[in-house]
């Protein structure tokens, strides 16, 4: 417990809150270029091959982003849009790629939850 004099000399320091998406730098989305597109395996109770991409953003930060939906057309040098949102069973993946924008195609034959996957309304 500090004395009054100690508090006058040096005030209490605020504990900085950790940001969940630091690479976005307070922007809702960011543009970037894929440097590597690959699959990775999730944490212990789950088993799959999750599609992820290493993306170099316009602010020169390189992040790992998840590619949602079934099937994708991304490859190296594809220009993508990134939003926040982590993938719980992939450590270090704190961003999602936005489907249906820039070089990323929407999910084919998607009927429900279409807006999240950039799919047009079926005829």
UniProtKB/Swiss-Prot annotation:
Q: Name one GO cellular component term.
A: small ribosomal subunit
Instruction: Indicate, by first and last residue, each region the UniProt record lists as having compositional bias (Basic residues).
Output: 113-123
Q: Per the UniProt entry, what are the Gene Ontology biological process annotations, in alphabetical order?
A: translation
Q: Where is this region: Disordered?
A: 104-123
A molecular function (GO) term: structural constituent of ribosome
Modification sites for 3-methylthioaspartic acid: 89
Q: Which domain of life is it from?
A: Bacteria
Keywords on this record? Methylation, Ribonucleoprotein, Ribosomal protein, RNA-binding, rRNA-binding, tRNA-binding
UniProt cross-references to CDD domains, sorted A to Z? Ribosomal_S12
- What family is this? Belongs to the universal ribosomal protein uS12 family.
HAMAP family, A to Z: Ribosomal_uS12_B (MF_00403_B)
Q: Tell me, what does this protein do in biology?
A: With S4 and S5 plays an important role in translational accuracy.
Q: Outline the subunit composition.
A: Part of the 30S ribosomal subunit. Contacts proteins S8 and S17. May interact with IF1 in the 30S initiation complex.
- For this entry, the protein name equals Small ribosomal subunit protein uS12
Origin organism is Oleidesulfovibrio alaskensis (strain ATCC BAA-1058 / DSM 17464 / G20) (Desulfovibrio alaskensis)
